[in-house]
Amino acid sequence: MPRGEREQLIVEAAIAEFSRATYAGASLAAIAAQADVSKTLIISYFGSKEAVYAACVTKIGTQIEQAVADALNSPHHLAGAGAAGERVLAAIFTTFEGHPGDWHVLFDRSVPHGPARDAAREQRTILRQQAFAGVSRSLGSVGLTDPVDLVAATGVWEHMVSALMLFWRNHPEESAAAMVARAHRVLAAMAGHTLDRVRG
């Protein structure tokens, strides 16, 4: 197997292990077992657990960034703030279908200060900037243009997405389509629409 492919297999195994055990609880030995390789091979490829984690969060962050960018650049994004938000959520849910716990690897609070935490922070910063741009465009279309309001709205959006992903992690039997529908109902109800109207 080419080295590049084997590295990707190791990263995928590491994401699963970090999702299951957190950074603090994960070990290179456990990752090696999941990837069906030796711990020595992982060290020769990556050098350290921190470097493995950095590769993981880079992959996760890139996946989210691309999915959200595609949703934001879609013509359907112009259909209104609510529809745009649901489209972004649908893109995120589709990306993580079958492995919703991957999202939380990027937000793992057990990661110590150092290169690993810096790598995760870098990815979160990119996603926060992307979220701010999307929120500003969507909510600007309905009149919310105050810069501080938009910063607050971006924080609300980020925490809402994380809450939905935590729910999904705790209910992994839910499909991406089911999560899209659930988010639609919740957001519509919070906006004051009746469920009969939403279902209709």
Question: Predicted regions span which residues?
Answer:
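Helix-turn-helix
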Residues: 9, 13, 17-51, 55
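Alpha-helical DNA-contacting segments of helix-turn-helix folds
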Residues: 54-60, 67, 123, 127
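Hydrophobic alpha-helical connector segments
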Residues: 55, 69-101, 141, 145-147, ...
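Regular secondary-structure segments
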Residues: 15, 19, 65, 69-72, ...
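Short helix-capping/turn signature of helix-turn-helix
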Residues: 46, 108-113
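Hydrophobic/aromatic-rich alpha-helical bundle segments in the mid-to-C-terminal region
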Residues: 103-104, 108, 117, 139-187, ...
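Amphipathic alpha-helical packing segments from all-alpha helical-bundle domains
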Residues: 65, 94, 115-141, 151-155, ...
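Pre-recognition alpha-helix immediately N-terminal to the DNA-recognition helix
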Residues: 9-17, 63, 87, 91
